[in-house]
Amino acid sequence: MKEVTANKFQRVEQTDIGEEWNGTSLTYWKSVRIAFFQNKVAIITATILLIIIAMAIIYPTVSKYSYLQQDYKIRNLKPSMLHFFGTDEGGRDIFTGVWQAARISLLLGIIIALINLTIGMIYGGICSYYGGLTDDVLMRIIEILANIPLLVIVVQVNLILGPSIFTFVIAMTISGWCNIASLIRGQFIQQKEQEYILAAKALGASTSRIVSKHLMRNIISIAIVTITLEIPSIILLESMLSFIGFGSAMLSWGKMFYTASFAIHFYPYQVLMPAFVISITIICFNILGDALRDAFNPHEVVLKK
């Protein structure tokens, strides 16, 4: 047997063997942004929504027609180049009215969604963090409120306070936050068992700090998706309630439906034109919400290199 000596081996340098990483690391929010902008449908949807919001803000101000002024000489005109959506029973330009009503409908949707989200996050956070008897009692309250029909709440609040925007906001927020609170509670329960929460408790962090600095930050993505999907639901509910006479007192899309419903058999365009804008708005919000949900979920998003 030949003897193996050191001179039969050659030293191999290690400098060129190791793998080198020349790429840039992605933070969570950067990966979300990349995933969202890769979704072409989401970009188109967001652009349409921005146009709708811009039209609601700008067009009623620059339009040569005022929806508040009636002109019976041009009543019930069909859509034309002068009046894109035609005119109504009072001779008012429907195209101008749609964008003026959009101000109230969109504003109500955003305000009510923000209020419901705020109440739901606080309530759901308290339920999940303390647990036990506190959680049981608070969840029973949610079950009671959530099972009261919305129409009953709206009618009772209108009878007590009278029809107004303030009344409508109160009616929509009495039980509107319940589903959000249940969703946030479930997310909080998942998060509070994580190691970083246990570490914060071990370091002596207060309850308020743990909730605000740790738990809230980790469900912000859920909050963004929730509010995006909540807005179209509120707009649709406002339109439905205004159509049956229980909506806000000011001009809104639902109010336009209610006014045009008396002439729908003779002038269907007076309902169809506002309905088209409302449908586009609601569809865009729902598509945007789904796109945001996909972008915020790192387990389902596949980033292109």
Region spans (language model):
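Gly/Trp-centered helix-boundary motif
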Residues: 1-117, 121, 125, 132-136, ...
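Residue-level recognition of transmembrane alpha-helices
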Residues: 48-49, 97, 139, 143, ...
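Transmembrane alpha-helix boundary and packing residues in multipass membrane permease domains
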Residues: 52, 125, 154-159, 168, ...
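Amphipathic cytosolic juxtamembrane alpha-helices at the membrane-cytosol interface
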Residues: 92-107, 131-139, 189, 193, ...
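Glycine-rich helix-loop "coupling/hinge" segments at transmembrane-helix boundaries
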Residues: 159-160, 172, 187-188, 236-277, ...
